[in-house]
Amino acid sequence: VEKMKQLIVITGASSGIGAAMAKAFSAKGHPLLLLARRVEKMEAHKLENSLSVSVDVTDAAAMKAAIASAEDKFGPVGCLINNAGVMLLGQADEQNPAEWSQMLNVNVMGVLNGIHSVLADMKARKTGTIINVSSIAGRKTFPNHAAYCATKFAVHALTENIREEVAMDDVRMVTIAPGAVETELLSHTTSQDIKDGYADWKEVMGGVLAAEHVAETAVFAYEMPQNVCVREIVLAPTRQQP
């Protein structure tokens, strides 16, 4: 009997990069735990050996419970991909502080909640991979991105910090930092001016990355031997200048 491949857990798996990652890892024969709020969108992927659970990443207990149920079925988590994120753009003096809280909760606490759910077990087993989807906005600043950049700089920092902590336990921590990608990410930004500006920018670049390109980088990093940690991958449209 062929040994089943390792379980991959993906947050924000209902659309965009998370959905593309689910399809890419499924095509490689991995069982999947897909986590997002919109369960029907995840089930619509119709992927073999996949479990879709409606989980808000800010709910640590729900995340731990979902992971435990998937591990009962598919064995221990081989790779966790913290991909769920929100981007709410606005000027610092005008933006609703509730939007800052939402971003900090999802983009930072959500990632930490995911890590907390699997890390002790990975250390005990002396193997495992955690891939955190950050952003180029975790490396440099952009207009109207103050709080978003704060959350993504946080993701870069915590990933590298934990990487050093768990390196001797043979656990890999990977940061993927995409530039502009074709997803629903911008759809919740409230300012129409900012949305229009983004659309114009996309046109100047002649299009943006497809989510599949980001998914391929995750597969690449994961499929390296366990003694090779691809610490960070930065990818963007060739014509994206900043």
Model-identified regions with their sequence ranges:
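The beta1-alpha1 cofactor-binding region of Rossmann-like NAD(H)/NADP(H)-dependent oxidoreductases
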Residues: 54-65, 97
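Substrate-binding pocket helix/loop in short-chain dehydrogenase/reductase
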Residues: 91-92, 96-101
